[in-house]
Structure formats: structure tokens, C-alpha cells
Amino acid sequence: MQIHRLSPQLINQIAAGEVVERPASVVKELIENSLDAGATRIDIEVELGGAKVIRIRDNGYGISKKDIVLAVARHTTSKISSIEDLECIKSMGFRGEALASISSVAHLNLTSRTAKQNEAWQVYTERYTEKVMLLPIAHPVGTTVEVLDLFYNTPARRKFMRAEQTEFKHIEEVIRRMALARFDVTFILQHNNKIVQHYRAVKEPSQYWRRLSRLCGNTFVNNALKISWQNIDFSIQGWVEDPSCIKLPEMQYSYVNQRIIRNKLINHAIRHAYQDQLKGPHQPSFVIFIVINPQQLDINVHPAKKEIKFYEARKVHHFIYQALMTVLQQRVKLSSDTCYSTTQKPIGKIIPSHALNQLNEGKNNILVSYSAAAKNADELLSNQIIQDPDEAKMQDIPAKCQATKNSCSTSLSNDFYSFGKMLTFCSPCYALLESAQGLSLLSLQFAERYITERQLTPENNSDTILAQPLLIPLRIILSNGEASALHQHRLLLQRMGILLQPNENETILNAVPLPLLRKKNLSNLILDLLRYLNNETSVTYHKIASWLACSLNSQITTWNYSRAIPLIAEVERLCPHWIKNPPNALIVKLDLKMAIKALNNS
């Protein structure tokens, strides 16, 4: 098979497969560009759920004539220029591939004007050609991006698009998340020439509740606790569920430096803070904003920038946990003393965008000492004053909380699914945990092996594990015994996501399930698997999954908090019954009585 260089159009379409999943992905990328351009108003117009037209108009800085043609080229950006910039990302976008990727699967028109220019300029690609055209046009200061006929040249992708209303709901959710992150920006959404949503900019933090009620609903607003906590490294602001009030619809939005992200570490810290507050498997609702020095983050870990990694995961986890515990404990104390007869003013305010910029530049003077804040938590809470009657409305507590106040102060650990708080590692592969029942030691190796086994095992005989196609199919030479095992168990392996194409004394590996992608040498793994199957008289999904899990996880030698905490959370989610009755190989309670007795006698 001859190796050849891919064409620029094909390269862009491959990149678009990662960036442009559906119309909502296009809307997200373009809005992020508008926010990076300093826009205070963004108009979003879509037709037919975004399949026909997506038009994003903003009043940002605009793009000059000399840069506008370059803007639609791949890997061109004004946001970073060096490795140092990549390690300290302050903008929403940074890769410089969004416009190029979109233009490879749709017809794109880019119109922009800066304040220094007397006329605007438009760049567009001629249909069915790669030629870029530039012409002058009338346009106010700012930028308009028009995306027409999305996936017109990739019928397979267009076939997988959902119904018009479904795609539009995804776009609405993107706008909702963006509007929560940027209270200072007006968002106007139109669908089929009708205004569907109009979120007006809110300048004063005391009025944030107005947008919050529109985005999250009055039920959440009327039963949410305001959280505001800071130390020298981090800041957390937002609203969290009051566990003593009515059960809220599960709504979880977390932002880091104004970027909407999903992160198991954040969710785990919040869930542990609520471990004695909520009954059963109900998950707490929250809208939180975390500010952290961008040098302490790795944002370049996901094609759509939906995930991040913290360099100091343990410190972040501990900070979030302590911040929420302080707010929840103060609420319980206030409940037992006054039964919420007073109205609470939120502690502090949401950090404005200029504060984030100061933090990015290292000016940490906007943050106060965490220890000092913790010391004065009672004083901060007792000295709260209502400044706005509408703000008081947000903090009103329903009368029905009276009936449930006693439940907050009692432990609900029997009903909550958690092994406890992770303290540290014990070599080589154990985590030291602390819970209401004491200290325990959890085997991370056993936990990871079990999770991998679950990922590789179909729910029933009719199910099929999702296969991940390999970029380059792998050719594997087989012995007679290995070929015989493949012939006998090929369909079973196929249902497990391992797609092998036999051909005399060799096979082509086309796809594997996600966990197997971690394996460096897939060829050896497949050969070992076929030898194992050839020696087994009875083969089941569970046996193969167990063998693969042991083979994959035997290579793990080092652990970190970013890896361990989400793993423990995943075990808690998949196997809540293990909290009360764990397998002996997973966790063991530590008895410190003998050690304490020995110390006392020495």
C-alpha cells in the first residue's frame, strides 16, 4: 500500500470531522470567535435547524482587509504565536482551524470591518471550487459569518443529522451555556426568521439573577445558595442547590475561566461535598464559575475543547470541596438556629471579566487568603444585608423547608453512594480514603480493571460495543492456531468492537473498542488474545473482557489525582451497591487502634 500526501481539502474535512459534529458545533465555534473579538452583542440566525443557514453577527473589533483572506486558511490565528502562549491560553479559541474546517463542509461567507476602515470586506468560497474571492461590501463595525448548506459535500455526515427541532434544541443549549458564562453580552437567537430567545446583557452583579432565572428557571433561582470563595490560587463563584429544600431538576453547569467544560474531578468534588446532604443517587444542581491561572490548565486535550486537565488536580479538588462544605455547613447552622427566618445575601460577587484578565497576568491581588476567608465565614454570613428586593426574592426559602430541616443535620451516609474523600496514594496502586466510617485503602488497579471490563462487555447477547476505526488498518500475520481461533470466534469479537478481516494466513485489524486504543502494541495484544482463545474450551464475552482488562491494566505503574479521582467516581456511579458491600479485592478498612495502642505504650 503506497503512502501519499493528503490534499488540503481532505485534510480540512478530516479536521472538520473532529470540530464540526453538528450545526450546534458550528454555532459554538463562531460564538467563541465573537467573544474573543470583544463583542457585546451577538445575533444568531438559523434556518432548518442550522442545516440550511447559520448566520452569526457581532459588534466586535472586526478583521482588517489584510488579514481577512488569511482568516479562512487553516492554522491561522491572532490568539497565539509561541509555545509559551499555548501553555497560557487566555482566549476561547486558539487552534486557528474552525473557519477552515467549516468552509470544507459548507459554503462560508465571512464579512468584517474594523473601526479604522471606511468599508467592509467579504471573503467567500466559490461553490464546488476552492477559490477564495474578496470584494468590498457595506457592513457595520464587527463581523458576520454565514454558513450555508452544512455538509453539502459529505452526504454521510448529513444523513446522521437529526430532525430540525432536535438540532435546534442543541443550538439552544449552546446559547444557554454561553449566556450563563457571559452575563455582559447580549444574545439574540432567531429560528426560521422568528426571535426565539433574547438574553439582554446584565451589567450589575446584583441583577445576575434575572438572566439566571430565564436560563435555569425560577425553581432553581428560588432554591439556590450563592457561593463565593477565594484563595491565592483559585476562585469559585456561582449557585448551588440548597439540599434542605425541594428537589431541583438536575442541572449541572461548570465553567473554568469562562469556558464551559465537563470534568469528572469537579463533579466528584461537588458530589462529595453533598454526601451527607442529599438522599439516594440524586445529583446536586449547580452553576459554578472557577477562575484559575491559565498556566495551571491544559486546554489542548479535546478536539472540541470540552475537556481540560488541571496540573494540580488535588489542590483544585480540595478547594472546591472545602468551598462547598463551608456554604452547606453555614446553611445547616443557619437552619437549626433560625429555620431560615432571615434572608441570605450572596457572599461576594461574580468576578468580572477584568478580574479574570488580572489573574491571567499574574495580578493575584484580586484574591484574598483562603484561610482568612474561612476564619471569618461566620462573620461574613451574619453581616449580610439585602440591597435589592428582587435579590431577596432569589434567596427566599420555601416554608416547606421547615419540615425537612432536621434531615440536613443528620448523616445520610447510608443512603449516599460514596467511598469517601481521597487523601493520598499508597505505593504502588492504592488510594487512602477517609469517610464517616474511618480510613480505608482502595485498590486502583482492581477498580480500573473492573471499569475496563465493563466497557468491553456487551449488556446482552444482541448488543454490540462501539468500535473505533483505526486511522491506518493493521496487518497481522497469523499462525494456523491463531487463524483457527479467529475463524471460530470472529463474530463474538466483532460484537465486542474488535473488527478483524481474515485473509488466508493473515488478518487486517480495522477497528477496536475505545479502551484498546491505549495499548501501544495492538498487534501483540491481538495475537496474545487469539492464542488465549485457541487454548480455551469455553469462551464468553465476560471471559474475553476479563482477559483484555488484565492485559491492558498490567502496564500501569504510576497514578495521579487526575486519573484516580474520576476512576473512583466512575466505580461509585456504576456500582453503588459496592459502597455497603465492596469486594474484598477492591477496598479494605484500616484499623488504627493497634497503632495508637503501640504509640501510647511506647
Curated annotation (Swiss-Prot):
<dbReference type="Pfam" id="PF01119">
    <property type="entry name" value="DNA_mis_repair"/>
</dbReference>
<dbReference type="InterPro" id="IPR014790">
    <property type="entry name" value="MutL_C"/>
</dbReference>
<dbReference type="InterPro" id="IPR013507">
    <property type="entry name" value="DNA_mismatch_S5_2-like"/>
</dbReference>
<dbReference type="InterPro" id="IPR020568">
    <property type="entry name" value="Ribosomal_Su5_D2-typ_SF"/>
</dbReference>
<dbReference type="InterPro" id="IPR037198">
    <property type="entry name" value="MutL_C_sf"/>
</dbReference>
<dbReference type="InterPro" id="IPR014721">
    <property type="entry name" value="Ribsml_uS5_D2-typ_fold_subgr"/>
</dbReference>
<dbReference type="GO" id="GO:0030983">
    <property type="term" value="F:mismatched DNA binding"/>
</dbReference>
<comment type="function">
    <text>This protein is involved in the repair of mismatches in DNA. It is required for dam-dependent methyl-directed DNA mismatch repair. May act as a 'molecular matchmaker', a protein that promotes the formation of a stable complex between two or more DNA-binding proteins in an ATP-dependent manner without itself being part of a final effector complex.</text>
</comment>
<dbReference type="GO" id="GO:0032300">
    <property type="term" value="C:mismatch repair complex"/>
</dbReference>
<dbReference type="Pfam" id="PF08676">
    <property type="entry name" value="MutL_C"/>
</dbReference>
<dbReference type="InterPro" id="IPR036890">
    <property type="entry name" value="HATPase_C_sf"/>
</dbReference>
<comment type="similarity">
    <text>Belongs to the DNA mismatch repair MutL/HexB family.</text>
</comment>
<keyword id="KW-0227">DNA damage</keyword>
<dbReference type="InterPro" id="IPR020667">
    <property type="entry name" value="DNA_mismatch_repair_MutL"/>
</dbReference>
<dbReference type="InterPro" id="IPR038973">
    <property type="entry name" value="MutL/Mlh/Pms-like"/>
</dbReference>
<dbReference type="GO" id="GO:0005524">
    <property type="term" value="F:ATP binding"/>
</dbReference>
<dbReference type="InterPro" id="IPR014762">
    <property type="entry name" value="DNA_mismatch_repair_CS"/>
</dbReference>
<dbReference type="InterPro" id="IPR042120">
    <property type="entry name" value="MutL_C_dimsub"/>
</dbReference>
<keyword id="KW-0234">DNA repair</keyword>
<dbReference type="GO" id="GO:0006298">
    <property type="term" value="P:mismatch repair"/>
</dbReference>
<dbReference type="InterPro" id="IPR042121">
    <property type="entry name" value="MutL_C_regsub"/>
</dbReference>
<dbReference type="GO" id="GO:0140664">
    <property type="term" value="F:ATP-dependent DNA damage sensor activity"/>
</dbReference>
<dbReference type="Pfam" id="PF13589">
    <property type="entry name" value="HATPase_c_3"/>
</dbReference>
<dbReference type="GO" id="GO:0016887">
    <property type="term" value="F:ATP hydrolysis activity"/>
</dbReference>
<dbReference type="InterPro" id="IPR002099">
    <property type="entry name" value="MutL/Mlh/PMS"/>
</dbReference>
<protein>
    <recommendedName>
        <fullName>DNA mismatch repair protein MutL</fullName>
    </recommendedName>
</protein>
